[in-house]
UniProtKB/Swiss-Prot annotation:
Organism the protein comes from: Bacillus subtilis (strain 168)
Residue intervals of the N-acetyltransferase domain: 31-180
Record protein name field: Uncharacterized N-acetyltransferase YesJ
Alphabetical keyword list: Acyltransferase, Transferase
SUPFAM superfamilies in UniProt: Acyl-CoA N-acyltransferases (Nat) (SSF55729)
Enzyme Commission number(s) from the entry: 2.3.1.-
Domain of life: Bacteria
Record InterPro entries: Acyl_CoA_acyltransferase, Bact_Acetyltransf, GNAT_dom
Gene (name only): yesJ
Family: Belongs to the acetyltransferase family.
PANTHER family found in the cross-reference section: AMINOALKYLPHOSPHONATE N-ACETYLTRANSFERASE-RELATED (PTHR43877:SF2), AMINOALKYLPHOSPHONATE N-ACETYLTRANSFERASE-RELATED-RELATED (PTHR43877)
Gene Ontology MF annotations: acyltransferase activity, transferring groups other than amino-acyl groups
Main EC class the enzyme belongs to: transferase
Short name of any one Pfam family annotated for the protein: Acetyltransf_1
Length: 180
């Protein structure tokens, strides 16, 4: 299990954060697939592998390792995020060899369409920065498809710095966070 401390369980009125458990796996996978379908219907290929049954981030294994966090309202799954304290093979391919010791890797941030438009995505991202503490980690890194202007704009508004593009078409962002 990963060493972390949840500093703030509440992220908004009635929404709370907690580590995912094995029993959450099916609903999390369903949320991610529905999000991939929603993205596809809007012309994006982000997360398209999920629609083919491919899960490069191994949701179930990541839950077992303590890397997946759910956000619920009245026990209903509202959002999910994966926070890796060490880079995956995917992250190493995108980011190269530098800066891994002090980085958290954020993946699979998804909000249920039922809760869309309430600023929940921004609150989950803020929670990843300040609502949970990973010892000795001073930055969050994330990637997204290069053709999503809305997502790029969102990350920049949230204070993430564009770090460049990977040869395979992914944009890289990172943000410094306070380590205690």
């Amino acid at each position: 299990m990963t060493a972390f401390k949840i500093e703030n369980e509440t992220i908004a009125d009635g929404f709370y954060a907690c580590p995912a458990v094995y029993e959450d796996a099916e609903s999390i996978t369903g949320l991610l697939v529905r999000t991939a379908e929603w993205l596809r219907d809007r012309g994006s290929n982000q997360w398209s592998g999920l629609l083919k049954g491919q899960d490069i981030h191994d949701i179930t294994g990541s839950i077992e390792k303590g890397h997946v966090f759910v956000f619920k309202k009245d026990e209903e799954l509202a959002a999910v995020v994966m926070l890796l304290p060490a880079p995956s093979e995917w992250d190493r391919t995108l980011w190269g060899d530098d800066g891994h010791e002090e980085s958290i890797y954020l993946h699979r941030l998804a909000v249920s369409r039922r809760f869309a438009g309430q600023g929940l995505g921004a609150r989950v991202l803020q929670w990843a920065e300040t609502g949970i503490h990973f010892p000795e980690k001073t930055r969050i890194r994330l990637d997204c498809v290069a053709d999503s202007d809305a997502l790029h704009s969102f990350y920049r508004r949230m204070g993430y710095e564009f770090m460049g593009a990977d040869a395979s078409g992914y944009h890289l962002f990172e943000k410094e966070i306070t380590a205690e």
